[in-house]
From Swiss-Prot:
Family stated for the protein in its record: Belongs to the Integrator subunit 4 family.
Protein name: Integrator complex subunit 4
Record's subunit section: Component of the Integrator complex, composed of core subunits INTS1, INTS2, INTS3, INTS4, INTS5, INTS6, INTS7, INTS8, INTS9/RC74, INTS10, INTS11/CPSF3L, INTS12, INTS13, INTS14 and INTS15. The core complex associates with protein phosphatase 2A subunits PPP2CA and PPP2R1A, to form the Integrator-PP2A (INTAC) complex. INTS4 is part of the RNA endonuclease subcomplex, composed of INTS4, INTS9, INTS11 and inositol hexakisphosphate (InsP6). Interacts with BRAT1; interaction is required for the assembly of the RNA endonuclease subcomplex.
Gene: INTS4
Role this protein plays: Component of the integrator complex, a multiprotein complex that terminates RNA polymerase II (Pol II) transcription in the promoter-proximal region of genes.
Gene Ontology molecular function terms on file: protein-macromolecule adaptor activity
Compartments reported by the entry: Nucleus; Cytoplasm
Record carries keyword Repeat: yes
UniProt cross-references to SUPFAM superfamilies, sorted A to Z: ARM repeat
Length: 963
């Protein structure tokens, strides 16, 4: 046996390997079916015009690629020449216009054919559609002046067509393609330059009103394109103001306004007199006259345009508020003026009354000075119009003119105050907002203030709060006015307790604006007596707090006022200064230290040192890779603490400081999770450390979502860094999961998903990759081919090494960044009385919250209700529930419906506001994604929510239903 084995060992084995010829793989070329061929087949199958029209309608619903457009156009033109039915030719002409707008297709190749078929066409409808197609071609080729002039020539030839539709399209083409310059390029030397304005102006007197309207709109289109219109157009436009059709009058009003802005100082003669006037004043009078037009559409447009005519003379401006009666378009003269004219004339009469039957010249109403007739009482008519749209437009115009003229603001005050009693809520609200905008130029009299304060009884919360805002910036003339305002506001507080915060804020500004008027009222308001001690008021009374807010804010600039305070007033001041610091200012009281605010006034102007400190702190942190892990952690912790404190001290730097601190916190969590002592020992022996790393990865993910969606002003540079940090957190999560998961099947799927995330990052942020040198993603993309073919264990090992070796990316700070915040005003969460309702039914809970620096609150802000049993309910407020009182500020006033089964005792539910986000909607779209590759469902879905308000606890008690 041994000999046999020995023999086998020494034997030589030979093996012949014959290379087999590889079978050549068959290459398949996938081609898309030709759109032009399919259309040709369909049109050939059509047995009637109705069938052909149906095929064309089906084709119009399908998208066409740029490379297929020319072939499709040729097929359509071929069938156009063969087709006898005008409806089919009309549809083909429409399709030619749509196809010429296709991105990536140059329509100059079909222009000659379009012009040829235009010259032979007899149908007016098809002619109009072909002109529309030529307009689309010319709009697509704005740089080719030869084509533009050729199309203008075609339009001019067809302007004599009998159809109004054809003339309309020709004028539209002239307005959009007419040459703005007199210089002609070499390509267009053969074509004579035309005076487009004169051609269009000739059609101002066309017999068809639709053509007249199209001519005016074409002239306005020339103005929008940058061509300066001739002043001669002004007289033509003025004649159109008396046109029988409202569309013509509406367009003419707009054209007159445009010319008045181009030539405001030009002098124009007044008809039937030797006087002259500025063009802007004349135009103002004519537009004022249109405020009394028979059509409410024209009246609205005229009223809106009046507000933008700020160059008009003050004399004509003040005439708009003149209530003098008009007779035959002339001012009614006084009896003295009439008698004087009568006796000075020396005219004959019957003898019973001097000048009784003297012949008088008949008044020519058309020759009367239009300035006198138009501007006189224009706003009076507008504010008393039967249509509320006209009244709103007149109020807005008054606001714009009053802001530029303080004298006009004083004169229009009575009219605005009268509008507070309008029957339409929208008009009342607009009047209040208008008056608030001009409040710096006016001082209210007592009778006006009385009318204004009467609106506090309005049932609309929006009206009342708008009036509170108005009173914040209103000047009152007397102490009786201040007392009247306080009394009415306290009545409002009694009738509508939910207005408490708005009324307190109103009294804060009312007191700070009128310290000298509040001073003589202090003894009466505080019920103090020179000889007797009075009872101490209840500090829980909102009305008493309102009075104190008024007095304390007035005392800030009135040093003699604290001497009138009693002892309990000083105690109440200390209490309110702590509890309502945003309403009660710091006062220098006798015998007491100044209660200073968090930021003293001497520090406020010095913003540069704070900004410098912020920059130095961040630059110091960016040298982390040169430190040992322990030193890096300590440096990050100290810097985060400094940035948080800086945000508390400097409110204007709070957003930047919090944003930077959050980013550094993510880096700190990553460094702690990657400590070597956690990874040198087998994972089963360090389950606690694995949980720590997993929690760190989860927290980093949450912090990155906060950075991306809770801050306004974040630019694309910051979004890239945030997504990079999130990718590192996902890599850490994969590493931890790989160490604690048994089996390879789950890891294959997780690795594949992570590599898809990397590919996703590369595709969407490809333009920013050069700025990510030596970063985690940069190294990851270099090793991407190797990672695609590696086993999960090797992928995890590579990721762990790269996470430790990757550089700390520099976070560029945006210029202006603010953190989103929300404060729930109602419910206050102070009541111990439960809200009782029958189980199974619903109860409405009023929610009132202020939102700061929230982007798109209508789609992102949600209300969450958390029940004691762990159930959570998310409510989507209606868009109408959001108000926008100022830039960066929103107000949410809504109702939340609660329901639950019966409870044995009252418990608390938590109400908070959430910020919903979807990261895919924030990422910039790439060119190849514009074709609708992403479904709309993905973009509108909610990926997660971030709490951004403190929770408020509300007692509720669902009672069992009675049987």
């Amino acid at each position: 046996m041994a000999a046999h084995l020995k023999k086998r060992v020494y034997e030589e084995f030979t093996k012949v390997v014959q290379p087999q010829e590889e079978i050549a793989t068959k290459k398949l070329r996938l081609t898309k079916p030709s759109k032009s061929a399919a259309l040709h087949i369909d049109l050939c199958k059509a047995t009637s015009p109705a069938d052909a029209l149906q095929y064309l309608l089906q084709f119009a619903r399908k998208p066409v690629e740029a490379e297929s457009v020319e072939g499709v156009v040729r097929i359509l033109l071929e069938h156009y020449y063969k087709e006898n039915d005008p409806s089919v030719r009309l549809k083909i002409a429409s399709l030619l216009g749509l196809l010429s707008k296709t991105a990536g297709f140059s329509p100059d190749c079909i222009m000659d054919d379009a012009i040829n078929i235009l010259q032979n066409e007899k149908s007016h409808q098809v002619l109009a559609q072909l002109l529309d197609t030529l307009l689309a071609i010319g709009t697509k080729l704005p740089e080719n002046q030869a084509i533009q002039m050729r199309l203008v020539d075609v339009a001019c030839k067809h302007l004599t067509d009998t159809s109004h539709g054809v003339r309309n399209k020709c004028l539209q083409l002239l307005g959009n393609l007419g040459s703005l310059e007199k210089s002609v390029t070499k390509d267009a030397e053969g074509l004579a330059a035309r005076d487009v304005q004169k051609i269009i102006g000739d059609y101002f007197s066309d017999q068809d009103p639709r053509v007249r309207t199209a001519a005016i709109k074409a002239m306005l289109q020339l103005h929008e394109r940058g061509l300066k219109l001739h002043q001669t157009i002004y007289n033509q436009a003025c004649k159109l103001l008396s046109d029988d059709y409202e569309q013509v009058r509406s367009a003419a009003v707009q054209l007159i306004w445009v010319v008045s802005q181009l030539y405001p100082e030009s002098i124009v003669p007044i008809p039937s007199s030797n006087e002259e006037i500025r063009l802007v004043d004349d135009a103002f009078g004519k537009i004022c006259h249109m405020v009394s037009d028979g059509s409410w559409v024209v009246r609205v447009q005229a009223a809106k345009l009046l507000g933008s005519m700020e160059q008009v003379s003050s004399h004509f401006l003040e005439q708009t508020l003149d209530k003098k009666l008009m007779s035959d378009l002339r001012r009614k003269r006084t009896a003295h003026e009439r008698a004087k004219e009568l006796y000075s004339s020396g005219e004959f009469s019957s003898g019973r009354k001097w000048g009784d039957d003297a012949p008088k010249e008949e008044v020519d109403t058309g020759a009367v000075n239009l300035i006198e007739s138009g501007a006189c009482g224009a706003f009076v008519h507008g504010l008393e119009d039967e249509m509320y749209e006209v009244r709103i437009a007149a109020v807005e115009a008054l606001c714009m003119l009053a802001q530029s003229s303080p004298s006009f603001a004083e004169k229009c005050l009575d009219f605005l105050v009268d509008m507070f009693n309008d029957e339409i809520e929208e008009v009342r609200l607009q009047s209040i907002h208008t008056m608030r905008k001009i409040s710096n130029n006016i001082t209210l009299r007592e009778d006006q203030l009385d009318t204004v304060l009467a609106v506090l009884e309005d049932s609309s919360r929006d009206i009342r709060e708008a009036l509170h805002e108005l009173l914040c910036c209103t000047n009152v003339s007397t102490k009786e006015g201040i007392h009247l305002a306080l009394v009415e506001l306290l009545k409002n507080l009694t009738k509508y307790p939910t207005d408490r915060d708005s009324i307190w804020k109103c009294l804060k500004f009312l007191g700070s604006r009128h310290p000298t008027l509040v001073l003589p009222l202090v003894p009466e308001l505080l019920s103090t007596h020179p000889f007797f001690d009075t009872a101490e008021p209840d500090m829980d009374d909102p009305a008493y707090i309102a009075v104190l807010v008024l007095i304390f804010n007035a005392a800030k600039t009135c040093p003699t006022m604290p001497a009138l305070f009693s002892d309990h007033t000083f105690r109440h001041y200390a209490y309110l200064r702590d509890s309502l610091s945003h309403l009660v200012p710091a006062l220098r009281l006798p015998g007491r230290k100044l209660v200073s605010s968090a930021v003293s006034p001497s520090i406020i102007p010095q913003e540069d040192p704070s900004q410098q400190f912020l920059q130095q702190s961040l630059e110091r942190v960016y040298s982390l890779q040169h430190l040992d892990p322990q030193g890096a952690q300590e440096l990050l912790e100290f810097t985060i603490r400094d940035l948080q404190r800086l945000g508390e001290l400097q409110s204007e730097l709070a957003g930047v400081a919090d944003f930077s601190a959050t980013y550094l916190r993510c880096q700190l969590l990553l460094i702690k999770a990657l400590q070597e002592k956690l990874w040198n020992v087998a994972a089963p022996l360090y389950l606690k450390q694995s949980d720590l790393a997993s929690a760190a990865a989860k927290q980093i993910m949450e912090e990155t979502y906060k950075m991306e969606f809770m801050y306004s002003g974040v630019e694309n540079k910051q979004v890239v860094i945030i997504h990079h940090m999130r990718l590192q957190a996902k890599a850490l999560q994969l590493i931890v999961t790989a160490r604690t998961t048994r089996g390879l099947d789950p890891l294959f799927g997780m690795c594949e998903k992570f590599l898809q995330e990397v590919d996703f990052f590369q595709r969407y942020f490809i333009a920013d990759l050069p700025h990510l040198q030596d970063s985690f993603v940069d190294k990851l993309l270099d090793l991407m081919p190797r990672l695609m073919t590696s086993k999960p264990a090797e992928v995890v090992k590579i990721l762990q090494t790269m996470l430790r070796q990757s550089a700390f990316l520099h976070l560029p700070l945006p210029e202006q960044i603010h953190k989103a915040s929300a404060t729930i005003i109602e419910p206050a969460g102070e009541s111990d009385n439960p809200l009782r309702f029958t189980s199974g039914l619903v109860v409405a809970l009023d929610v009132d919250a202020t939102l700061e620096h929230v982007q798109d609150p209508q789609n992102t802000v949600k209300v969450q209700v958390l029940y004691p049993d762990g159930q959570a309910q998310m409510i989507h407020p209606k868009p109408a529930d959001f108000r926008n009182p100022g830039p960066g500020r929103h107000r949410l006033i809504t109702q939340v419906y609660l329901s639950h089964t019966a409870w044995t005792e009252a418990c608390q539910v938590e109400v908070r506001l959430l910020l919903a986000y979807n990261s895919s909607a924030r990422i910039p779209k790439c060119p190849w994604m514009e074709g609708g590759e992403m479904s709309p469902q993905v973009e509108t879905s909610i990926e997660g929510t971030i709490p951004f308000s403190k929770p408020v606890k509300v007692y509720i008690m669902p009672k069992p239903a009675r049987r």
